[in-house]
């Protein structure tokens, strides 16, 4: 079986999304964000819903399905060019930007672009690792009670930006299994490994896991507290290192890497105890 090279340049979409007030409010609640801040402007993390408007079309493509016995979302990048208004139609296009094989894995760069009322709003890329072989089994763990949630801090109001090298205010995060179902409904990411124990075990996981892009949303929320702009984030890039189980407490922390007139760069991490789960960088609008 050959790789996925022949799909480079293939497009999926455009797919329209209607960010109605109710849908945006549902998404804000599902990600634990600030409803007052996002009453008229779509939150940056709504990029997650844009990606999953088109990514399933790629992953369910009959030419791709044989390669999805093992699927890892290893990296994600988003860049925003302007605010998107609640109620303004968002059109999303996905594209296979690159594909190569290495050590039995297919490395695919899946690009996404979105416009709001015809004007560019978002661009980004997801790095997927796909294989025709099933993932190695992990030690199975018992699922926590569906409603068990660790401490989770609301984003709160804006904060003064620290100096270069100084720490951001930590934010405790985590999700219950019910939270994961709510997020799946709000984002369109219905991958069963986030809600069905046996699907997760079959994928080589100990049990259900928190959506990677939900954790990315939490990281973006911390960064966005350091900007009062309607477009608080100019970019966010993350690398997924380990999974987070529901009901496990975690925290987003960060430091100021560089300050400039055009934007402030932040280094971000999401840890669960001593385990580093995600590393990332964000550029915040002054």
Residue ranges of model-derived segments:
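HotDog/MaoC-like acyl-thioester-processing domains
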Residues: 1-7, 75, 80-169, 243-286
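Hot-dog-fold acyl-thioester-processing enzymes
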Residues: 1-75, 135-232
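A conserved acidic, glycine/proline-rich C-terminal tail/linker
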Residues: 226, 230-242, 251
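Intrinsically disordered, low-complexity sequence elements enriched in Ser/Thr/Gly/Pro
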Residues: 175, 193, 237-239, 274
């Amino acid at each position: 079986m050959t790789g996925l090279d022949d799909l480079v340049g293939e497009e999926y979409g455009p797919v329209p999304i209607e960010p109605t007030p109710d849908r945006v409010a549902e998404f804000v609640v599902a990600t634990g964000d600030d409803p007052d801040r996002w009453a008229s402007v779509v939150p940056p993390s709504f990029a997650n819903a844009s990606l999953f408007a088109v990514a399933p079309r790629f992953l369910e493509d009959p030419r791709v399905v044989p390669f999805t016995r093992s699927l890892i979302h290893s990296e994600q990048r988003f860049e925003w060019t302007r605010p998107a208004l609640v109620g303004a139609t968002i059109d999303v296009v996905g594209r296979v930007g690159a594909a190569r094989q290495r050590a039995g894995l297919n490395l695919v760069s899946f690009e996404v672009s979105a416009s709001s009322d015809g004007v560019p709003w978002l661009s980004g890329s997801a790095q997927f690792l796909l294989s025709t072989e099933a993932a190695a089994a992990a030690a199975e763990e018992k699922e926590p009670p569906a409603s068990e949630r660790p401490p989770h801090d609301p984003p709160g109001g804006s904060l003064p930006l620290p100096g270069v090298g100084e720490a951001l205010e930590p934010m405790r995060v985590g999700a219950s299994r019910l939270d994961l179902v709510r997020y799946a409904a709000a984002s369109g990411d219905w991958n069963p490994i986030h809600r069905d124990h046996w699907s997760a075990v079959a994928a080589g996981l100990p049990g259900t896991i928190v959506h990677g892009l939900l954790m990315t949303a939490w990281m973006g929320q911390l960064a966005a507290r350091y900007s009062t702009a309607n477009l608080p984030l100019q970019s966010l890039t993350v690398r997924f290192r380990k999974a987070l189980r529901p009901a496990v407490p975690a925290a987003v922390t960060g430091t100021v890497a560089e300050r400039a007139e055009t934007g402030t760069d932040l280094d971000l991490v999401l840890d669960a105890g001593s385990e580093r789960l995600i590393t990332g960088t964000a550029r915040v609008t002054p």
